[in-house]
Amino acid sequence: MLTARLLLPRLLCLQGRTTSYSTAAALPNPIPNPEICYNKLFINNEWHDAVSKKTFPTVNPTTGEVIGHVAEGDRADVDLAVKAAREAFRLGSPWRRMDASERGRLLNRLADLVERDRVYLASLETLDNGKPFQESYVLDLDEVIKVYRYFAGWADKWHGKTIPMDGEHFCFTRHEPVGVCGQIIPWNFPLVMQGWKLAPALATGNTVVMKVAEQTPLSALYLASLIKEAGFPPGVVNIITGYGPTAGAAIAQHMDVDKVAFTGSTEVGHLIQKAAGESNLKRVTLELGGKSPSIVLADADMEHAVDQCHEALFFNMGQCCCAGSRTFVEESIYREFLERTVEKAKQRKVGNPFELDTQQGPQVDKEQFERILGYIRLGQKEGAKLLCGGERLGERGFFIKPTVFGDVQDGMRIAKEEIFGPVQPLFKFKKIEEVIQRANNTRYGLAAAVFTRDLDKAIYFTQALQAGTVWVNTYNIVTCHTPFGGFKESGNGRELGEDGLRAYTEVKTVTIKVPEKNS
């Protein structure tokens, strides 16, 4: 049984981490029962109960049992957090007067602390989210550390320029922080999404009020303690735990929040955009849902394409906004591809996420679990051919067998709607123009992939597919160096890379009258 106690002394948490490494293997042993050190709201570098004194349970998806209870923030708590963030952002505050290079040093210090506590954080993520420890440790924590270091390097390099202009004038631009930024993150990659949003916002000098997903609050709260330990001034980062319709809506509607960044469903994205428009026209960036196509041409490396399309869908239990959730295969190789795909899905190890050879853990919660099973039943009802999986695994926790559907038609709901689970629909196509039209026939446009040995065809697909990211002969390659975001209803704006900084700065033009201008 995985259990955890609340509010234990920090020393006990440190003891749990320092003894966890295995000297016999590159991958350290996880901590199956990580102690829970923080369960309150983090406002102004202090821990607070919710104003209402309410709490809510966070559940271990591996067992379905409650790990502990966390403060349930709402509008009153958001008001306090925004007030703290606004004070930290006032002219003359320690944060506003801090050198840009010092902001970078603090971000690097935060990365150092994450690296120090990597095993503990990965274990906490696996406990609360259900993802396999090997993925939490190797993939997620690696990305978290890199994203803080990457934007630390940008802190003193993101600046304006001088502009030659007519007349007796001197002109330059300033890249100024937007101000108080509301950030709302999802449950599928809690620490990664926290880093994607915090790092560029802090590198450019903003202050933050972040609402973390109610399903996975624990790792974000622990990282808040590292923010304080790193030396960030009070009020610069504030972390609220609570529900979307209360705490999340309060951030989106708040008249003293200058920008909101949201990652989550397209449906909630519409609500965020509407709330921003009906309040103070705050800046908005949205990273939303997807129904991303993976297109396999007849000349592709078959084994590689099968492997990549498998991971494109089943990675992170299918709970990935850019999951390759529509696999289009050219007719001449469809049968062989289908057989290999089904065999690979059957071989995928589903089980305890703390076991190092587990490839797939549970879905994040009961609601998501039941939603996915509902889509599987719907696919069967609509006439898609269930080739493997299609049911829960075991009687405990929220496990679903890897599921593959064949002979899926474009009009089926499993072909059009975001399932967000381990369900891979396979489609057959004959011609390139046909599959491009079908791939683009969706309200989404987050990502796409094409598998081919023909460079001319590959380049043509990268131009024709309506998606913010197009991969060629690979999938899910997302790094802190490259911009990420969607077309159409998959969102607006970009995160990561140099483009990710633009969302957190305003460009100010300064023009000065000079008595005499010389070149």
From Swiss-Prot:
The keyword Acetylation applies. It is found in: Mitochondrion matrix. The active site is at E287 (proton acceptor), C321 (nucleophile). It comes from the Eukaryota. Keywords: Acetylation, Mitochondrion, NAD, Oxidoreductase, Transit peptide. Its EC number is 1.2.1.3. This is Aldehyde dehydrogenase X, mitochondrial. The gene is Aldh1b1.
